Amino acid sequence: MLIENFRPGTLEGWGMSPQELHQLNPGLVMLRISGYGQTGPYRDLPGFGAIGEAMGGLRHLTGEPGRVPVRVGVSIGDTLAALHGTIGVLTALYHRKVNGGKGQVIDVALHEAVFNVMESLIPEYSAFGVVREAAGSALPGIAPSNAYPCQDGWVLVAGNGDSIFKRLMDTIGRPDLGAAPDLADNAGRVARVQELDAAIGAWSAQRTVQQVLDALGNARVPAGKVYTAKDIAEDPHYRARDMLLSQTTRDGFTVQVPGIVPKLSATPGTIRSSAPHLGDDTDAVLAEAGLSDEQIALLRSKGVIQ
């Protein structure tokens, strides 16, 4: 298989179009990731993950209402493109296996990978003319579900189920809200969401994160601490599930890295090596492809490889 993320037309200009490559290797699976895809009026425009997040609709929904659209916090556009590309490659490899060994091209556009996870954004607009807007830390149309301050951090509380809401209100000392007829369902709670958020926030602000989690846990109300990197690195649950692994880099440094997701029962996988420097694995890859030491040395002497 071949993976490339040049601007569309670059490989064609090098004489390496899919048609030319498939003549040499009909079974080739080729993943092409670009800003706007291999076709369409925007195909020749340059694009990065951030631009894909903007065009895909994500940036418009991220941040506080009426404020500047903000970044999610990680390079989610690039990650989503990679995940969609992986799904496409696995599908194409399976197709090749069961349908005579023929390869194909997977075309992933950054903005489409983002758009594909935007839930009901377009159906809402198509059916009702609703343009969804940024909602800050809250979950739009669901109440109460938000981040609330504590003395030493923040917690996320999802008290939006009808019975959960009543238990939440009892826990924070507001049974009057839990018993209010107009708050018995989500629609009524959404109408009074600011009042509910204020009540929960006033209660949580007088307690530590752990006190809040203990109280809500006893009441079977879904809640969780807003973790920092330090919190994750020291968390026993992460360690118990092998999500914090020690890895020695090729420079000799020992660092913690994320474990493997998803977890397969029969073939859980492992991290075999750290990330290479540029060219570290060239000889091994070429040898695996059948080149001799002499052929590899010749390529290096001609400057084809380093």
Model-based region annotation:
Residues 234, 294-306:
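Amphipathic terminal alpha-helices
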Residues 143-219, 223:
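Aromatic-enriched alpha-helical interface/lid elements that frame and gate functional surfaces
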Residues 184, 252-298:
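Flexible, small-/acidic-enriched active-site or ligand-binding loops
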